[in-house]
Amino acid sequence: METRRSFIRKSVIIGAAICLPAAVGRESLAAYPDLKTRNPKKALVLWYSQTGQTSRYARLIACILKDRGIAVDVRDMQEFDKNGLASYDLIIVGTPTFYYDTPDNVRDWLQTIPLIPGTPVAAFVSFGGPEGNQHNAATHIIKLLLEKGGVPVGRDAFRNIASYPTPKWNTANQISGQHLPNAATFDQVRRFAADVLERITRGQAIAVGYEMALREGLRVLPLIWLNKKLISKHTVDAAKCIDCQTCVKKCPTKAINPSRQTVDRDKCLACFGCLNNCPADAVVMEYRGERLYGFPEYLRRNKIVILEPPEFKACNM
C-alpha cells in the first residue's frame, strides 16, 4: 500500500520545475541592523513541539545559556505573549519540520510579532530523516525574524527519531533513526548554542541563504490538503476518551473537539499532534482505511527509550 510519504514524494516531479530559482536568495551582511548588544543578559528560547523532540533541544540550549550566566526563559510558543519579545537580548526559535517547511502555525505566529530591532536571533529545526528540506525550513524562520529587525547569529537542524505516523511505523527513516537523539546529537546542540554566543560577542552575523533542494519546490504544492484527502477517517473514540484535553492543547488550530468526537477538517493542519499525544489512544485516524497509532504507542511496542541529555539532571528548565 502506498504510504503518505511516497504519495507526497511523487509530487517532486512537479515541484522540481519550481524549486531551482527559489534556492538562490542570500541576504547581504551589510543589510542587517547593528546588534543591540554583544553581551546578552536575558535570552528567550521559544519552541513549538508535538512529541517532545524540539522542546528537548530547546531545554538543552536553555541549560547551556544558563550555565554561561545568562537569564533564560524557555517557553512553548503557543502559550507565550509575543508582546514580551522586545525585552530579550537574544531570541532562539525551534520547531519541527512539517511538510518540508516551517509549520504554518509557526509562520503565522512569527508574522505577527512586534519589531525586535537589532536583537540577535537564531533558529533550529528538528527532523526525522534526511532530505526533509530542514536547512531551508530553518532559513524560513530566520527570514521571518529578519523582517522584524532581528540579526541572524545561528541556524541548525537536529535529527531525532521520526514521529510522523505511518500504519506500520516501518519506513526507512523511522527505522534508521530509532537510536536518535544520541550523544552526538546533543554535542551538536551544545556547539550550536556556543557558536551563537561566540558570534554575538564578535558582533558577527551569519549569511542567510537557501540550499538547492528538490523538497524546496514542494512548498508551493498544497501538501497538507493532499494529505488530508488521503486520511479517510479522523475522529475521537468516545468510549476511550478520558477528557484530558491533551488533543485540544496540542492542536495548533483547535480543530478537534473531543466532547463531540469531531475534527474540523478545514482547520486541521494534519500535524498529527492529537494522535501522537493522546494518552488513551482515543484519537481515531485512518489512512486509506488503515488505522494509524501514535508516537507513544510506537515507542511502547518497540521498547524504545529516548535518551535525555545529562544536563537535565542538574538543570531544571
What are these regions (language model features)?
Residues 162-212:
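Glycine-rich phosphate/pyrophosphate-binding loop and the adjoining helix
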Residues 236, 242-269, 273-291:
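Iron-sulfur cluster-binding cysteine motifs and their immediate structural context
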Residues 214-242, 249:
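A mid-sequence, solvent-exposed acidic-amphipathic segment
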Residues 1-18:
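N-terminal secretory signal peptides and thylakoid transit peptides that target proteins
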Residues 22-50, 56-63, 67, 72-74:
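C-terminal segment of N-terminal export signals and the immediately downstream linker at the start
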Residues 54-58, 62, 106, 134, ...:
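Short, highly selective alpha-helical patches that border small-molecule cofactor pockets
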Residues 34, 77-160, 272:
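Helix-loop-strand module that forms the ligand-binding subsite of alpha/beta enzymes
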Residues 27-31, 270-317:
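Flanking helices and flexible, charged tails adjoining ferredoxin-like Fe-S electron-transfer domains
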